[in-house]
Design a protein with these regions (language model features):
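HAD-like aspartate-dependent phosphatase fold
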Residues: 3-137
Length: 137
């Protein structure tokens, strides 16, 4: 998928890695996802925002803590709501019932951005924030 994407001259675009539960639609934990996914309420503008990024040529990767057992119901929901994406990745480590407070993503990519979703899909803006980086030797 990424090789085909690169060969189309998309190197100026971004890969958006987007969670589903609590981000695209209301939180439906794995324990209730079989019965609640179909009717899970979408966050306003989520579909429009993501589909716009897709249409602009960006790569959309959905990364969720849902398990392989929930793949079909998840894909059915995505098809029903018309969300455009390139890749669905399941089995993201779950934080819900652990002592961990968040994710820390490490990559060799020169451009790395992170946006905490707080319930509103709107334009992304730049802010000067303190970040954690590896110490230079």
């Amino acid at each position: 998928n990424m090789e085909r994407f690169r060969s189309r001259g998309k190197m100026d675009k971004l890969v958006y890695i987007i969670d589903l539960d609590g981000t695209v639609w209301e939180d439906t934990p794995n324990e209730i996802a079989h019965t609640h996914t179909k009717d899970a309420k979408l966050f306003d503008n989520a579909i429009e925002w993501i589909n716009k990024k897709y249409d602009e040529g960006n790569y959309i990767c959905l990364f969720t803590a849902r398990t392989e057992a929930l793949k079909k119901i998840t894909e059915d929901k995505l098809n029903t709501i018309g969300l455009k994406y390139h890749q669905l990745m399941l089995n993201k480590p779950r934080l819900r019932h652990t002592e961990f407070k968040g994710y820390h993503y490490i990559d060799n990519c020169a451009v790395l951005k992170s946006s905490r979703f707080e319930g509103v899909w709107s334009d992304l803006v730049e802010k000067d924030l303190k970040i954690t980086v590896f110490k230079d030797d």
